[in-house]
Amino acid sequence: MQLTVKALQGRECSLQVPEDELVSTLKQLVSEKLNVPVRQQRLLFKGKALADGKRLSDYSIGPNSKLNLVVKPLEKVLLEEGEAQRLADSPPPQVWQLISKVLARHFSAADASRVLEQPQRDYERSLSRLTLDDIERLASRFLHPEVTETMEKGFSK
């Protein structure tokens, strides 16, 4: 089937692919045609991001469909890859192990793992956004909890 892939900058290409082609293979073809590295590509169909491991047919993409290509900045890709590598390299903290045990009682191993990923990403994102001022405030609250309590009582009057 014939597909059109259009980048936001206006470049586009037409590709001939089977309906059951993997998204990852399509990205490779787009890389060759538009000279955009695979790891910087994000393909969208009707506003939905396409996952590398899925097939075009999984998204009901048919002949003459138009896909949008978002090119991620290289810096963002490197940061994402670095964060993923850091998470993979570090042993899970005890809290994640405990949460994992609780989830394992209620979900299959695969589902429990997927459920756990989101809070871990949120936690990592929150930590990476802490400023020095935020850290100083937290440290002050831990080291001098009585001052924080006094201030809170003063505000509640």
UniProtKB/Swiss-Prot annotation:
Record protein name field: Ubiquitin-like protein 4A
GO molecular function terms attached to this record: protein-folding chaperone binding
One GO CC annotation: cytosol
Subunit: Component of the BAG6/BAT3 complex, at least composed of BAG6, UBL4A and GET4/TRC35. Interacts with BAG6; the interaction is direct and required for UBL4A protein stability. Interacts with USP13; may be indirect via BAG6.
UniProt keyword annotation of Cytoplasm present: yes
Residue numbers bearing the Phosphoserine modification: S90
Domain named Ubiquitin-like: residues: 1-76
InterPro entries: Ubiquitin-like_dom (IPR000626), Ubiquitin-like_domsf (IPR029071), Ubiquitin_CS (IPR019954), Ubiquitin_dom (IPR019956), Ubl4_C_TUGS (IPR041421), UBL4A-like (IPR047154), Ubl_UBL4A-like (IPR044724)
Residue segments, region Required and sufficient for interaction with BAG6: 96-138
Origin species: Pongo abelii
GO BP: any one term: post-translational protein targeting to endoplasmic reticulum membrane
PANTHER family found in the cross-reference section: UBIQUITIN-LIKE PROTEIN 4A (PTHR46555:SF1)
Keyword Nucleotide-binding applies: no
Role of this protein: As part of a cytosolic protein quality control complex, the BAG6/BAT3 complex, maintains misfolded and hydrophobic patches-containing proteins in a soluble state and participates in their proper delivery to the endoplasmic reticulum or alternatively can promote their sorting to the proteasome where they undergo degradation. The BAG6/BAT3 complex is involved in the post-translational delivery of tail-anchored/type II transmembrane proteins to the endoplasmic reticulum membrane.
Protein keywords: Cytoplasm, Isopeptide bond, Nucleus, Phosphoprotein, Transport, Ubl conjugation
Encoding gene per record: UBL4A
Post-translational modifications reported in the UniProt record: Polyubiquitinated. Ubiquitination by AMFR and deubiquitination by USP13 may regulate the interaction between the BAG6/BAT complex and SGTA and therefore may regulate client proteins fate.
Subcellular location: Cytoplasm, Cytosol; Nucleus
Annotated TM spans: none
Cross-link for Glycyl lysine isopeptide (Lys-Gly) (interchain with G-Cter in ubiquitin), residue positions: K48
Matching Gene3D superfamilies: Phosphatidylinositol 3-kinase Catalytic Subunit, Chain A, domain 1
